[in-house]
Amino acid sequence: MLLPRIATLITGLSLGALAQAAPTVYPLTVENCGSTLNFQHAPTRTVTIGQAGTEMLYAMGLGDKVVGTSLWFNNVLDKYKAQNDKIERLADNEPSFESVIGKRPELVAVELEWMVGPQGAVGTREQFHELKIPTYLLPSDCEAKDNLVGADGTRLAPFRIETIYKSVSQLAQIFDVQERGQRLNDELKASLAKSIATAQGKQLKDASALVWFSSAQMDIEPFVAGHKGIPDFMLSTLGVRNVVASDEEWPTVGWETIAKANPTFLVIARMDRRRFPADDYEKKLAFLRSDPVTRNMDAVKHNRIIILDAMAMQASLRMFDGIEQLATAINGYDLSQ
């Protein structure tokens, strides 16, 4: 039943709305993903490595505190475009360590630990901390997750949406904009409750799905969503089962295995990034409809293919829009076929 879940969300929203956010007292200490961060004042120069953190800061009216961005999957939301156009993009993907520190940041906000972490493509947290530059890693990518196992890490427990609310609250505290953070979290919780209600009346007892992010080459095993990750949370919240059983965040699974599972829906990522051929969702669609293995899947034959922005599959503000889009799409399908 989804109704208890809705009640819990509404209760959390009401309690949050009643609480009065207190201003930040500096010096501030924040415990973050195994590191202790210290702030003498609200950061005035921030570099973001990851679109999720960038758009969180924009949503709280902190765009003027951002001096450099990087790691983009989709174009920035239209409502943030004017602000984003004023800020240097250090890289579409991972920036160099030198380009980040060259912006003289007082904070580096990081979406993914494989960017800044023990084996970080940009550097380690210690490298930044030795220069007195704190690094804030979004909790969704470190809590109950081992990023040293599997290409994109392995979930030790199912993703918890509370980690997104925690990111918003902690960033709001760091920048002393707690009321903005509280308001944003209340909006996110209300959006989630609405999406769950949309799917409530649909008979989805045996419905299943596969989420295809990308592929290094079109003719090899695709990167798909594991069963404890963020897309799995999105599906299960709406009463849909993920056909992938791996604990890895984005494991590769063969199309023969996927076809045998024959998911009710296929969810594919749309992105503006062009690192891999399958980053282009139109190439994904063409492959699904032409490959002799995939074209006979029920989801392909009955056109039950849902297209979501890649960032809607990440622990980001866009995930809530993604859940709403999923709920609306699923609600519109005739599952009697």
Predicted segment positions?
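A short, structured surface patch at a secondary-structure boundary
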Residues: R45-P118
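Extracytoplasmic ligand-binding site segments that recognize negatively charged/polar headgroups
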Residues: M115-G123, I133-Q170, K202-I230
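Solvent-exposed loop/turn segments at secondary-structure junctions
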Residues: A52-E55, W72-N75, L107-V108, E113-P118, ...
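Short helix-initiation/N-cap motifs at beta->coil->alpha
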Residues: N32-G34, E88-E98, D141, D247-W255
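Structured C-terminal subdomain patch of bacterial secreted/periplasmic proteins
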Residues: P158-S167, I268-Q337
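Bacterial N-terminal signal peptides
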Residues: A7-A17
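Alpha-helical, coiled-coil/dimerization segments enriched in small aliphatic residues
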Residues: N74-N75, E221-W250
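Bacterial Sec-exported substrate-binding components of ABC uptake systems
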Residues: A19-E55, A157, Q173-W212, I330-Q337
